[in-house]
C-alpha cells in the first residue's frame, strides 16, 4: 500500500462541531449538517476570481472545437459525469463536447472498483480512449488533491498540451505542482470525518455548475435567463419550449406550435422565425451570421 499522507489533509480532520453527533436527536443532527453546508458557498465565494479565470481559459479552447473533460474517482468522478450528462438536454450541446470519466469505468458509477483511484496508468488509458488533444480541457477532480488516478490524468493532459485544471478542497495540494490552473475550495473538516461526499461533494457540484453554466451562456445557449437550446425529448420539455417561445414572442398559440413543429422544437429558431416572419432555413442562416447567439441577433438588431 502506497502512502501519500492522505490523513494529513484538512478534509480528514475532526470537526469539533459534530463530535457528539451520535448522541443528538434527528432535528439536532440536521441542524449541524445544515450549519456546515452553509459554509460551502462562502468558501467558494473566496475563489470566484480564480473560477472566473479558469472559465475564460476553457471558453477560448471550447469555441475552437475543444472539449471539456471531467475526470475523477468515486464521488468526484460521479459528480463530473452528472454535470456532463445534463448539458445535452439542457443546452443542446453535442454529447461528445462535455465528457465525464470515472476511475474504473461505468461500473464504478454505482459500485466502488477496488484500486481504481490508485491506478495511474488507467487514467492514461481512459484519456487515450477519447483521443485527448491539445484543444481539450481536462478538469481533474479530487477532494484531497492527491488521488493518483487524477494526478496522472493532469500530467497526461500537460503532455498532450491540453489545458489542465485541478479542482480540490484543500490549499497547496499536489495539484498545484502539476496543473496549469487549480481551483482550491477550503471546505474544511466534514461532519462525518473523511466523508467527502458531503461538504466537499457539495462544493464540487456547485463549482461544476458554475463552470458549465457560464460556458453555455457565453456560447449563446441562453437568452436572458432562458434555456433556448434545450432538447425537447419529453412532454415536460416540449411544454417548457412552448412557454419560452410564448414569453419571448407573445405570439398566438397556433403560430408557436407551427414554428416549433417546423424547427424540430428548437426554441431559438422558432423565436427568430416568428419575430422576423421568416422560414426555418432562413432563421438558420440568420443565426449562423450571429454566432448562433439570439442575444446578438435581437439586441444588436442584426
UniProtKB/Swiss-Prot annotation:
<dbReference type="InterPro" id="IPR005488">
    <property type="entry name" value="Etherase_MurQ"/>
</dbReference>
<feature type="domain" description="SIS">
    <location>
        <begin position="58"/>
        <end position="221"/>
    </location>
</feature>
<comment type="similarity">
    <text>Belongs to the GCKR-like family. MurNAc-6-P etherase subfamily.</text>
</comment>
<dbReference type="GO" id="GO:0046348">
    <property type="term" value="P:amino sugar catabolic process"/>
</dbReference>
<protein>
    <recommendedName>
        <fullName>N-acetylmuramic acid 6-phosphate etherase</fullName>
        <ecNumber>4.2.1.126</ecNumber>
    </recommendedName>
</protein>
<feature type="active site" description="Proton donor">
    <location>
        <position position="86"/>
    </location>
</feature>
<dbReference type="GO" id="GO:0009254">
    <property type="term" value="P:peptidoglycan turnover"/>
</dbReference>
<dbReference type="GO" id="GO:0097367">
    <property type="term" value="F:carbohydrate derivative binding"/>
</dbReference>
<dbReference type="GO" id="GO:0016803">
    <property type="term" value="F:ether hydrolase activity"/>
</dbReference>
<dbReference type="GO" id="GO:0097173">
    <property type="term" value="P:N-acetylmuramic acid catabolic process"/>
</dbReference>
<keyword id="KW-0456">Lyase</keyword>
<comment type="subunit">
    <text>Homodimer.</text>
</comment>
<dbReference type="InterPro" id="IPR046348">
    <property type="entry name" value="SIS_dom_sf"/>
</dbReference>
<feature type="active site">
    <location>
        <position position="117"/>
    </location>
</feature>
<dbReference type="InterPro" id="IPR001347">
    <property type="entry name" value="SIS_dom"/>
</dbReference>
<comment type="function">
    <text>Specifically catalyzes the cleavage of the D-lactyl ether substituent of MurNAc 6-phosphate, producing GlcNAc 6-phosphate and D-lactate.</text>
</comment>
<dbReference type="GO" id="GO:0016835">
    <property type="term" value="F:carbon-oxygen lyase activity"/>
</dbReference>
<comment type="pathway">
    <text>Amino-sugar metabolism; N-acetylmuramate degradation.</text>
</comment>
<dbReference type="Pfam" id="PF22645">
    <property type="entry name" value="GKRP_SIS_N"/>
</dbReference>
<dbReference type="InterPro" id="IPR005486">
    <property type="entry name" value="Glucokinase_regulatory_CS"/>
</dbReference>
<dbReference type="InterPro" id="IPR040190">
    <property type="entry name" value="MURQ/GCKR"/>
</dbReference>
<keyword id="KW-0119">Carbohydrate metabolism</keyword>
